[in-house]
């Protein structure tokens, strides 16, 4: 399985970097996973920032990717449902799943419309850094559920 995670903004908190690195270390033996950090335009107005971020996100998408965008208004599913969805996607060995984590303003409507699925991690709002860490933990949990290994109780 190939997973790409597009994140607007970079990680500034060392404890989150440590958590991200820990989950990448756990996942890499089983999943080809990479994270692409794209620039944030949070210093601009919301409208302009969303347009600029939309442009760079779209440039980083390829045909054939199954796109899952994280958004607080997306579908809320359990860890078990996430595992089923992730490992039952109709993708070939050469294609990939791409997750998109927006910046301070989220993602544009065009990005949402370009997505195959919109996922909510919670009704609460998280920084892009926390969203990345939570997503990686949920991908790891999904893998453990799929492999019927202890971790998820």
From Swiss-Prot:
It catalyses: pseudouridine(1915) in 23S rRNA + S-adenosyl-L-methionine = N(3)-methylpseudouridine(1915) in 23S rRNA + S-adenosyl-L-homocysteine + H(+). It is found in: Cytoplasm. Its main location: cytoplasm. InterPro entries: Alpha/beta_knot_MTases, RlmH-like, tRNA_m1G_MTases_N. S-adenosyl-L-methionine binds at residues 70, 102, 121-126. SUPFAM superfamilies: alpha/beta knot. Keywords: Cytoplasm, Methyltransferase, rRNA processing, S-adenosyl-L-methionine, Transferase. Disulfide bonds: none annotated. GO terms for cellular component: cytoplasm. One of its GO terms (molecular function) is rRNA (pseudouridine-N3-)-methyltransferase activity. CDD domains: RlmH-like. Its EC number is 2.1.1.177. It is an enzyme of class 2 (transferase). Homodimer. Belongs to the RNA methyltransferase RlmH family. HAMAP family: 23SrRNA_methyltr_H (MF_00658). Specifically methylates the pseudouridine at position 1915 (m3Psi1915) in 23S rRNA. This is Ribosomal RNA large subunit methyltransferase H. It comes from Dictyoglomus thermophilum (strain ATCC 35947 / DSM 3960 / H-6-12). The lineage of its organism: Bacteria, Pseudomonadati, Dictyoglomota, Dictyoglomia, Dictyoglomales.
